[in-house]
Amino acid sequence: VLCANDKPEDVFAPRQAGSLLTRQKQTYCAGEGPASEFAMDAQDLSANPLPERESMEFDVVIVGAGPAGLSAAIRLKQVNPDLTVVVLEKGAEVGAHILSGAVVDPSGIDALLPGWREEEGHPFKTEVTDDQFLLLGPAGSIRLPNFAMPPLMNNHGNYIVSLGNVCRWLAEKAEALGVEIYPGFAAAEVLYNDQGAVIGVATGDMGIEKNGEPGPAYTRGMELLGKYTLIGEGVRGSLAKQLIAKFDLAKDREPQKYGIGIKELWQVKPENHRQGLVQHSFGWPLGMKTGGGSFLYHLEDNTVAVGFVVHLNYKNPYLYPFEEFQRFKTHPAIRGTFEGGKRLSYGARAITEGGYQSVPKLSFPGGALIGCSAGFVNVPRIKGSHNAVISGMLAADKLAAAIAAGRASDEPVEIENEWRQTAIGTDLRRVRNVKPLWSKLGTGLGVALGGLDMWTNQLFGFSFFGTLKHGKTDAQSLEPAAQHKKIDYPKPDGVLTFDRLSSVFLSNTNHEEDQPVHLKVKDMDLQKRSELEVYAGPSTRYCPAGVYEWVEKNGEEVFVINAQNCVHCKTCDIKDPNQNIVWVPPQGGEGPVYQNM
């Protein structure tokens, strides 16, 4: 173990092993955090030089097999079948890390694959038949009339889907066109040429042991080089985060805002199922000061997706998003759906919520950001996959034209210059004030004024508010524990409500135990002085997978990282009040393996 002060400490962290929770020893440096924090690249620790990476060359390298990345790949081959295109996916399979509601606006798929409705085997099996909006109180609910909702909130013509299955279907389309897709390979490093332009990415090394040294099964990562590189990692992607910082892509933009979305998939009794029903709600249990909402989506085969979103600009460090979700299911208007049912799956993922004014500059030398890496979610609609598809198509069209003109590794500024004139710009511009109004004025007045603002944008094409600012980051929004009261949450009953560890088991999450911890604490002393002593350890609550614990050892509080439980939601990277936790990819193919999510 490499420790700057030669004082390693051992702490023990539970890991998931089949259906058992065993305990794995992790070694930390006293007062400094995980030893692996000082070894972001194994080459820094190894006494022996690592072998050179092998490389492969393509016209376009795409990071992330989500809706944006796969749509970009398909579009590139549609425009020019001779282009060589590769897609890297860190999940064990395409769709393994995809988590969404999801009610999909098909406009993006219509543009990409116009004849998809005539095909057999497409994943759009359940069209929305009923659209409901509920305001929940502690004991009752009020259904808001549909005629009062802005037209853009209407879900008729949309489809309830598993977005993971949509991505699997898109991957088949891409491969049929000649796209190479490599699941199980995490893009761990951006590669640059001598002029500082992006020329591709390198996959992570495999077989690095937890001390940072190459083990017996060590395999060097691969370089994938391209004339252009598209980053479609999803929300808070590790490479996108680096590129935004390196090229100052967030300059003159509002800070990005986020939510944490937690979802379960249930098999319910036939009498409790209404295929095509979409039900959105807000209010209880979050109250009127904390932003968020919830959904029930009735899919095919008597399955129901239930989800809960908490805006991550909440102030109270004692708030526990997972427990708020469990409480939500006990509401009289909600619990009946699940009586006699069985929970099938569980997962969680951060959501971009900053909208129009938080979208970073998309282009950089050698490539561009697409999809949720750029933040194209329409917050009030709770939809972003249609914009992800369109962004992938836009980027593909511009890169295909650039390559045809003999260009390579320059900045495709046309992507940045034109996205606001596409359907994405229209979609985000008209809802740009909903999130800041909600954040500043609360669920009651904020939501009402946000609805009014959507109506004025719909009818007159303008907003009385102009373009509002978000202000603080989500990390800065958290207040010291002394300013708040603890929240008592009921114990789970194991039938309708559950604990985190039994929930994580249903995500099929797995990580090799003998590897460096992929959740890096930059300063362990700061974590104790501030995160614990000032904020009462919010990481133990905001994480939906129980990754973080403060445990007493030898009379001292020690920060324990149960990295094996991580579902890759990225909440810690976003909400830690000191930005002291950094999420980096573990070995490729690890993390959750979501099915039908």
Each model region followed by its residue ranges:
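N-terminal Rossmann-fold NAD(P) dinucleotide-binding loop
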Residues: 69
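Extreme N-terminal leader/targeting segments of oxidoreductases
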Residues: 23-60, 75-84, 527-529, 533, ...
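Active-site-proximal substrate-binding core of FAD-dependent oxidoreductases
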Residues: 375-381, 393, 397-442, 560-562, ...
